[in-house]
From Swiss-Prot:
Source organism (scientific name): Malacoplasma penetrans (strain HF-2)
Sites annotated Discriminates between blocked and unblocked aminoacyl-tRNA: N11
UniProt gene name: pth
Broad class of where this protein is predominantly found: cytoplasm
Record key words, sorted: Cytoplasm, Hydrolase, RNA-binding, tRNA-binding
Full protein name: Peptidyl-tRNA hydrolase
Length: 187
């Protein structure tokens, strides 16, 4: 039986809800809603749902560690359930991608994003599949930028990007070749 983990990054708490840093959480919410699933497990300082299918076991999750320590949750759930690194897909915000765009990658460095940096460090590999959802470059302060909400205009673009990211997650979970997923969504 193959095991897969789709994890969206963000910060827990109402004060961070709908902020730019939480687009990974928002994507997970869309994925859960589409499949009528709920995060019904709390373990490893995170929340997740485990879905048993005939040939696969799927985990959809949100770390509750705060962004910068996301690797702790990912490492612990993967170790406990024996999820291989090639079966992990991480969704997170990216300041180097325009608002409303997504970038799908099979591996690479963190690009300075602390959540994926933590995961790369704890898992000891850059071979982590990921979907970066664009939040645009900050005008001034980076921390202020990622912890603020989107403008009304940008909210529409971001919601469309979240839907695309959710669709890419579904293709990953349906065993579509990852190169095909990248070619389809990196337009």
């Amino acid at each position: 039986m193959s095991k897969y983990l789709v994890v969206g990054l963000g910060n827990p708490g109402l004060e961070y809800e709908k902020t730019k840093h939480n687009v990974g959480f928002m994507c997970i919410d869309e994925l859960l809603k589409e499949h009528t699933l709920f995060l019904n497990n709390s373990k490893f300082n995170g929340q997740f749902v485990k879905v048993d299918q005939p040939e696969d076991q799927i985990f959809i999750a949100k770390p509750m560690t705060y962004m910068n320590n996301s690797g702790e949750f990912v490492y612990e759930i993967c170790k406990f359930y024996k999820i291989h690194e090639q079966n992990i897909l991480v969704i997170y915000d990216d300041i180097d991608t325009d608002v409303g765009k997504i970038r799908v990658k099979a591996k690479g460095s963190s690009g300075g994003q602390n959540g994926i940096k933590s995961i790369i460090s704890k898992m000891n590999t850059e071979k982590i599949k990921r979907i970066r959802i664009g939040i645009g470059k900050p005008v001034h302060n980076l921390t202020h930028h990622v912890l603020t909400k989107f403008s009304a205009e940008d909210s529409i673009k971001v919601q469309q990007a979240i839907i695309k990211a959710k669709d890419a997650c579904n293709e990953f979970l349906n065993h579509v070749d990852f190169d095909k997923i990248m070619n389809k969504f990196n337009v």
